[in-house]
Every structure is written in structure tokens, then in C-alpha cells.
């Protein structure tokens, strides 16, 4: 024993009696028996989703287990039946859909097996009560976890294991690359490093359960082994079932690593686990046929006494390691379930079941990945052939994202929200895209692509996947009513037109939501074909709002109760939340009309904007903030509520580079008032406060069915933090972001923000924090940067319509480096304070560029028309 260990042992022997006296938990009645401590941080409530955009996913949590499977088109993400395997009640078989273990044997010693997860139940590795039935296997002692979307890094250690195991799991995530970000597959990359003084034989095993046809027993199991094209593995499916069923398809494990062997089609510990205990490697066995039987001339999967049909297959990697040696093994999980059905809401009961999902299936929409792959093995082949490039590009995005000198917790919070793009998205074969409003393991919450929630959450999609965002807006256009009304959300059939709606109607904010998003998407991409395609629907929306939603004919939308995204908030007359959005929509319409030379619309938008700005100041500004509402033409009077989102329209127009909707000093004062009244340290930023109720609005005295005022919506908080950053209120923004970050860490829901259900869409507003830091506005190739920070050296990654880039300030030089894609710059506007020369010069990769400089208040605009592509010629600088 080392000297330090001996000293520690002696100290503990002397000190322990004193500790007993000082600590009542360890003394007296608690001295005997088993004493343990369970920490809140020990809970496993959320994790990173592994899978592709719209392809389904599996959630890996820090205990090494997999949750919330959606790869088989199953409920609640998609329209298939809930994933409930037929089994004895309360048997936690779902713990064993996918698992990894390691068999090891040190020279001259008995073999041991360790399960690379920590279980809460008795079902482990497709066994039950292993302490008795299979005592050679146990879970590892310790798992160290790091999650940085899309990567999950884990280290498994155990005092009985003579090595350490590391795992990196991820699915490719590459901004602006839809194909490779929607792959139905996962990479699991293992490394085992031996610390044993003696040689140790190791067999790493990955096991997957065949879940095809999970909802029916009228099937038989089928498997296919692969040992070609440089990879080995297996694919599992089911025969004898309807090949148009949503659960029909294949799933499997594949590898291009050496020393790979398989055991396909096992069900019971006999003989699989008995062989595993004694064997150094598998024998390339396919025993699938013994999982089936023929009864009455019909072939069916064997059904146990519990009506359970079980079929597992395993992939193994063997090596003999000396001290310091490493076994590297990669496993690729791939799937192909092509029959994704659309569905329409329908409340009819299902007589065959004791529950109803509330919809009826329409037709097969398919998955985007079906444009490229016809089987799970084709998916695996593509992923393995391109694994280096897929890893490099996914890691390149992450490295660039974190190569920024802002607070790490800010970047972590933004990064964590990207998880929702995987958990909650649908991407059909034709490219239709939507994100579910909310999601819990038992049900979806709300429709797809809810337009009011998209106002916040689409800040991420327009930045990272603009083509998907534009396609989502096209669906909303197709759902617009003949008179111009915009519907709240989209059903589970993204191919439907008007009849494919889901959710509430007649909300006043829906048309302004739609106009702002449509035009923002144009400004960010510069796609004039998209603008022309969508323009008639914008005009129809304006006409609808003026003719149907303007009761007092002042050209402003009127509220009459609960009629907006705050769907438990009554507002009356002129409401700041609605008015700021309407003015934002008109400012953007005016700008777009100029581009299209639509003089009639230009005149109308200008008139509304001028009149509405006056009303906003006269009827809603009270000297400190904009009142919640003012029923100045009716009988309700003024509601002095201090809504956090009272000037959300300013947040939107900043992103479009359109300057100020309201007096700059009023914007600043309103933000200060919101922080003063509504921010509570270590709690959060409340949605709304009232001066007469400084602590809590008395919701219990009202007839409102849920408390939206006193509570915090992280999507609102993070978007508001972005607005604070645009206005240079960095300290307040950081308070809010840190509070949100800490709150969700405490809750164990870091990867699963809650509002109306979990994995809520609104918190994807977090991406606007980056835009706010940069003061970034993008308007059809005209880029504005106005970072309100007090740093001589500053760098920050950002993403835009056609690529990604890095913004740098280095003393008296400003530069933009294009990292991926291209950037078409018509003009570049930057603050004068960062430029030391009166006549600064623009350079492209060190060569002067001919420009025209225009002074704009405290900024300088440089006019030039330049396409900058990632690569060797990718840096534009001003000095």
C-alpha cells in the first residue's frame, strides 16, 4: 500500500468516532443498517436524442440507458401505435431494446461481464434478476458523462474491470446539409484501454432487439447477415405482416472494425449467455429461424406465455490486450421504416383498444431519407463509407460554435436547445418539414409548426436549415383560408391543404406572425423566388386583418379577450404584444414592397406603420413601459400589465436589420422596467407583472384556468435575453440566461425544456442570443453588425441563410470569416467605434476591395457586391 494511503487509513481510524459524535445521521439509530445518500443530480430525466432530423430518434441518458424511441414511426412523435411490446405487466423490457456490455478475462482468472449502464429495475441486458440467474454480469460502478449536442461522451469504470471504456455516440448534424443531418442512424465509437499487468481478453458486445412490427403478433422474425463491402453486421425485419404498415422496416447494427463477429436471433439466456460466458468471440451464428414456429401451416414468431415475442441480435469485437493497449470498435446502428403516415384529427374511439389517439391515418408521406436509401443496410453502408467526413463536419460545426469568447454557459444553453430539432421534427419524403409544439413520452402537445411559437423557435431553423424553414412556411401558405386567415398549426399530415389544420382559430396574432416569419426568411436568405411565391399570401393576410380583425377601423388589430399566444391572458383593444408585431410586420412589408416595386402595398404599409407608431406611443406608453393593453375605443380601459414580450416586434426587426420601431430611449426604459418588475433572482423572468401585485398576480381569484403570468417560459426568457443583447444590456441578459441554465440543470431536464409539454419548440429562440451579441441584422445581402460589448478582442460564430461564419474584432480591425457555404454581401455596416481610421479600407483575403462608404449615425456602411465562399478566399476585413 502506498504511503499516502496508509496515512489516510490511520487518519480515518482515529477520526471516525469523532465524526459519529458530530454527525447525528451517522450516530445513534442510524449507525446500524445501510446508509446511502441520493442526490437530485442522480436522477435521469433527459438526454441527447440520437437520430436524424425527421428520421426518429433514441434518447441516451447519463445512466447509459436508451429512452423515448421513435424510429418505428411510433407515437407520440409520429402516427403509429405507441411503442408497447407485448410482455408481462410491469416487466421493464424496454430497458433492453439496445444495450452494450463487455466480457473480459484476465490471464489465469475467471471471466467477468459488465453492463455499460446503470439500471433502476430488475430487467438488465434482456435478463431479469441477474444477481441470481447470471451472477457473472453486473452494471458498471461509475459513468462519467458529457453531453454537447450532437455528441454524447461517456467513460465507464469499475474497480473490478482492468480497463477503462470510453464511448462517443452521435448522429451527424451539419448546418445547411439536410441530407446528412436527417440520416436514420447513430455512430457508437468505443475505445477500451487496458490497465492490467497481465494480458486480458476482451469481447465488446452491442445488442439490439428486433422491434419491427412491434404492435402486432401476426408476423415472423427475419434477419440478414452482412459480410461484404468492407463491413459486417446484421439487419432485422419481420415477414408475414402488412408491408404498408408504419412499423414495417428494418433495423440493425453494422461495423467496419476488425475482429467483428455476430450472434443473430437469440431470445433466452440459454444458450446465448452460457456461450458468452465461455467464449472469446461469437461464431457468426444466425438462429433467427428458431425464434419462429409453424402452426396450422402459418409461420409466426414464437409467443411466450406472456404473449411476448423476443428476438435479439448481437455484434461483438474481440481482442487480447496488454497493459496500455487499446481496442477501438465502432458500431453503427441504422434503420429504415419508410411508411410514415400522415394523420388527421378525429376524436372517434377505437373499439379494439381501451384508448384512442384522436386521429385517423391518411396516406404515406414517407421520410426524407427514403429519397436516398431503401434499406437499413444501405443506410449503414453510406454512413460507414462516409464516417470520416460526417464526423469531421459535425465536429467542425461544434468546434467553431464553441470557439467564441463569451460565457460557456451561454453557449451550452444555446447548444442544448438543438436537441429539439431531433426529438420533435417531421421531414417527409417530399421535403415538408415541421416541429411539434410540445412532446412528452405519452403524447404530443399541440399541433406541428404552431405559427405563434414559430415566431420564437424558428430563429434556429432559419439560421441552420433555411430550406426547411421556408418549406414549413410554404405549408402554412397552403393552409391559408380563402379570405386570408392564417391557421394556428399543422396536423400530422404535412401534405394536406386547408383541411389539414389543427388547433385554435381566430387568434389575432396569427397573421402578423406569418408575415414576420415569411419576410424574415426572405431577408435572411435573399431568395427572391421565395418572396414572389409567398407575396400574394402576405397581401391576403393584410387584407383579412384589416377587414375582419379591426373593429374600430383604425387599421390596427383589436383584441377582445384571450386571442393570442398567451392563451390564458385576456387583452382588450390595442395590446402592446399584438401592436408591436403588427408594426414589425408592416415595416418588413414596406421593405419587401420596395424590392418588388409594389407601390400600392408600399403606400398601405407606410400608412399603417406611421399611424400605428403614433397609437403605440399615445395609447400604450406610460413613461416607463408599454401597457399590456388599452381599450380606448371600448369600455375596458387600460391594463397596466408589464408583459415581457411587449415589444417583441423590435426583436424581430432587429434580426432583419430594419432599425428601431419605437424610440430607442423607450425601448431601453421598457426593458429596464421589465427586469425591475418581473425578474426574480434564482427563479426566472415572469411573463407578466402588475404594479399593484409586485409579488404574485392573484390567479386564484380569477377564472383563468392556468397561471401564465407568474410563471416563466424559457422560450420567452431566452428570446428576451437576445433583445437585451441587441440593446447592449449584457449584464441583464446574462442574469436571465444563467437563471434558465441553472433552473433546468436543477430539474434534471437540461435537454427537455417544458411549457405546453416537453421538448418545447419556443426555447429554440435561444439562437437569437448569438444574433443579439453581434447586433446582427440580415436584409437581402445587407449585413449589419452592431455588437454592444466592451471588449477589444471579440469573436463569435454565427449562422445565416447560406452558410456559417465567424465575426472577429481585434482592436481596430473587424473581420468576417466564412467557414462553410457562401456569403453574398451587398453591404456591410459596422460601428465606427471599432475603426480607428477616418477612411477605413475593406480587404478580401488581404487585397483591397473597391467600395463606397456611407456614414450612418455611429456606423459606417460599406457598399460592395461580393460573393465570398468558404475556403482559401474567405475573409473580409475592415481596417
Describe every region a protein language model picked out.
Residues 72, 76-79, 83-155, 467-565, ...:
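Helix-terminus loop motifs that line ligand-binding clefts
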Residues 115-185, 268-315, 415, 419:
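Extended, loop-rich substrate-binding clefts of extracytoplasmic carbohydrate-active enzymes
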Residues 207, 406-415, 449, 455, ...:
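Catalytic cores of carbohydrate-active enzymes
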Residues 36-81, 292-320, 325, 329-340, ...:
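Substrate-binding groove/exosite segments of carbohydrate-active enzymes
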Residues 172-290, 315, 346-392, 836-853, ...:
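Polysaccharide-binding surfaces and accessory modules of carbohydrate-active proteins
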Residues 29-45, 129-133, 139-145, 151-162, ...:
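Gly/Pro-rich turn-and-neighbor structural signature
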Residues 156, 167-169, 204-208, 324-337, ...:
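Short, hydrophobic/aromatic-enriched beta-strand segments in well-ordered soluble domains
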Residues 67, 75-77, 86, 91-97, ...:
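Non-catalytic C-terminal accessory modules of carbohydrate-active enzymes
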Amino acid at each position: 500500500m502506498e504511503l499516502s494511503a496508509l496515512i489516510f487509513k490511520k487518519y480515518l481510524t482515529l477520526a471516525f468516532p469523532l465524526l459519529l459524535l458530530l454527525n447525528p445521521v451517522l450516530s445513534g439509530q442510524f449507525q446500524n443498517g445501510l446508509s446511502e445518500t441520493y442526490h437530485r443530480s442522480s436522477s435521469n430525466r433527459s438526454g441527447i436524442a440520437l437520430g436524424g432530423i425527421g428520421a426518429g430518434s433514441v434518447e441516451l441518458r447519463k445512466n447509459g440507458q436508451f429512452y423515448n424511441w421513435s424510429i418505428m414511426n411510433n407515437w407520440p412523435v409520429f402516427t403509429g401505435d405507441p411503442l408497447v411490446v407485448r410482455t408481462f405487466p410491469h416487466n421493464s423490457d424496454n430497458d433492453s431494446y439496445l444495450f452494450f456490455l463487455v466480457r473480459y478475462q484476465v490471464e489465469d482468472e475467471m471471466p467477468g461481464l459488465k453492463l455499460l449502464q446503470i439500471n433502476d429495475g430488475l430487467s438488465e441486458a434482456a435478463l431479469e434478476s441477474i444477481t441470481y440467474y447470471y451472477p457473472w454480469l453486473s452494471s458498471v460502478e461509475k459513468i462519467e458523462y458529457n453531453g454537447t449536442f450532437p455528441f454524447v461522451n461517456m467513460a465507464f469504470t469499475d474497480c473490478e474491470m482492468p480497463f477503462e471504456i470510453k464511448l462517443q455516440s452521435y448522429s451527424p448534424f451539419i448546418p445547411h446539409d439536410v441530407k446528412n443531418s436527417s440520416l436514420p442512424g447513430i455512430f457508437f465509437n468505443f475505445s477500451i484501454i487496458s490497465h492490467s499487468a497481465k494480458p486480458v481478453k476482451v469481447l465488446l458486445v452491442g445488442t439490439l432487439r428486433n422491434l419491427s412490427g412491434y404492435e402486432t403478433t401476426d408476423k415472423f422474425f427475419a434477419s440478414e447477415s452482412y459480410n461484404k463491402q468492407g463491413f459486417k453486421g446484421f439487419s432485422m425485419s419481420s415477414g408475414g405482416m402488412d408491408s404498408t404498415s408504419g412499423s414495417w422496416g428494418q433495423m440493425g447494427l453494422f461495423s467496419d472494425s476488425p475482429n467483428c463477429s455476430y450472434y443473430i436471433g437469440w431470445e433466452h439466456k440459454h444458450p446465448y449467455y452460457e456461450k458468452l460466458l465461455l467464449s472469446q468471440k461469437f461464431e457468426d451464428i444466425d438462429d433467427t429461424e428458431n425464434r419462429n414456429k409453424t402452426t396450422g401451416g402459418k409461420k409466426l414468431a414464437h409467443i411466450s406465455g406472456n404473449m411476448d415475442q423476443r428476438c435479439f441480435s448481437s455484434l461483438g469485437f474481440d481482442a487480447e490486450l496488454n497493459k496500455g493497449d487499446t481496442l477501438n470498435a465502432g458500431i453503427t446502428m441504422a434503420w429504415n421504416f419508410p411508411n410514415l403516415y400522415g394523420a388527421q384529427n378525429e376524436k372517434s374511439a377505437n373499439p379494439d383498444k381501451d384508448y384512442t389517439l384522436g386521429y385517423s391515418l391518411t396516406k404515406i408521406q414517407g421520410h426524407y431519407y427514403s429519397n436516398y436509401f431503401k434499406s437499413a443496410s444501405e443506410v449503414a453502408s453510406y454512413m460507414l463509407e462516409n464516417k470520416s467526413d460526417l464526423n469531421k463536419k459535425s465536429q467542425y460545426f461544434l468546434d467553431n460554435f464553441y470557439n467564441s469568447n463569451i460565457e460557456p454557459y451561454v453557449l451550452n444553453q444555446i447548444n442544448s436547445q438543438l436537441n429539439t430539432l431531433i426529438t420533435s421534427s417531421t421531414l417527409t419524403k417530399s421535403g415538408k418539414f415541421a416541429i411539434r409544439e410540445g412532446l412528452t413520452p405519452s403524447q404530443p402537445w399541440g399541433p406541428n409548426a404552431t405559427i405563434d411559437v414559430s415566431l420564437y423557435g424558428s430563429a434556429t431553423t432559419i439560421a441552420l436549415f433555411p430550406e426547411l424553414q421556408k418549406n414549413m412556411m410554404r405549408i402554412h401558405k397552403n393552409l391559408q383560408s380563402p379570405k386570408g386567415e392564417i391557421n394556428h398549426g399543422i396536423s400530422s399530415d404535412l401534405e394536406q391543404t386547408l383541411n389539414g389544420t389543427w388547433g385554435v382559430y381566430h387568434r389575432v396574432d396569427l397573421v402578423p406572425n406569418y408575415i414576420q416569419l415569411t419576410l424574415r426568411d426572405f431577408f435572411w436568405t435573399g431568395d427572391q423566388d421565395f418572396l414572389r411565391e409567398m407575396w400574394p399570401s402576405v397581401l391576403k393576410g393584410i387584407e383579412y386583418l384589416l377587414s375582419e380583425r379591426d373593429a374600430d377601423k383604425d387599421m390596427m388589430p383589436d383584441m377582445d379577450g384571450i386571442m393570442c399566444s398567451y392563451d390564458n391572458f385576456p387583452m382588450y383593444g390595442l395590446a402592446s404584444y399584438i401592436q408591436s408585431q403588427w408594426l414589425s410586420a408592416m415595416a418588413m412589408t414596406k421593405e419587401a414592397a420596395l424590392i418588388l416595386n409594389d407601390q400600392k402595398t408600399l403606400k398601405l404599409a407606410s400608412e399603417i406603420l406611421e399611424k400605428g407608431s403614433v397609437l403605440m406611443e399615445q395609447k400604450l406608453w406610460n413613461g416607463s413601459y408599454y401597457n399590456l393593453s388599452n381599450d380606448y375605443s371600448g369600455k375596458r380601459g387600460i391594463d397596466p400589465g408589464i408583459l415581457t414580450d411587449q415589444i417583441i416586434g423590435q426583436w424581430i426587426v432587429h434580426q432583419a436589420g430594419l432599425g428601431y420601431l419605437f424610440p430607442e430611449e423607450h425601448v431601453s426604459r421598457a426593458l429596464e422596467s421589465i427586469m425591475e418588475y418581473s425578474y426574480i433572482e434564482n427563479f426566472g423572468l415572469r411573463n407578466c407583472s402588475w404594479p399593484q401585485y409586485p409579488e404574485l398576480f392573484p390567479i386564484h381569484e380569477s377564472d383563468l384556468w392556468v397561471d401564465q403570468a407568474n410563471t416563466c417560459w424559457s422560450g420567452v426568457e431566452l428570446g428576451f435575453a437576445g433583445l437585451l443583447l441587441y440593446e447592449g444590456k449584457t449584464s441583464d441578459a446574462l442574469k436571465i440566461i444563467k437563471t434558465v441554465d441553472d433552473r433546468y440543470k436543477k430539474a434534471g431536464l437540461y435537454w427537455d425544456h417544458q411549457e405546453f409539454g416537453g421538448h418545447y419548440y419556443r426555447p429554440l429562440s435561444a439562437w437569437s442570443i448569438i444574433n443579439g451579441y453581434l447586433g446582427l441584422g440580415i436584409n437581402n445581402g445587407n449585413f449589419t453588425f452592431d455588437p454592444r460589448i466592451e471588449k477589444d478582442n471579440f469573436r463569435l460564430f454565427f449562422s445565416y441563410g447560406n452558410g456559417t461564419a465567424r465575426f472577429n474584432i481585434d482592436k481596430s480591425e473587424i473581420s468576417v470569416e466564412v467557414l462553410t457555404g457562401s456569403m453574398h454581401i451587398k453591404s456591410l455596416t459596422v460601428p465606427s467605434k471599432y475603426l480607428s481610421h477616418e477612411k477605413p479600407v475593406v480587404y478580401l483575403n488581404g487585397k483591397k476591395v473597391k467600395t463606397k462608404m456611407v456614414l450612418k449615425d455611429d456606423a459606417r456602411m460599406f457598399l460592395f457586391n461580393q460573393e465570398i465562399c468558404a475556403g482559401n478566399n474567405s475573409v473580409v476585413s475592415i481596417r
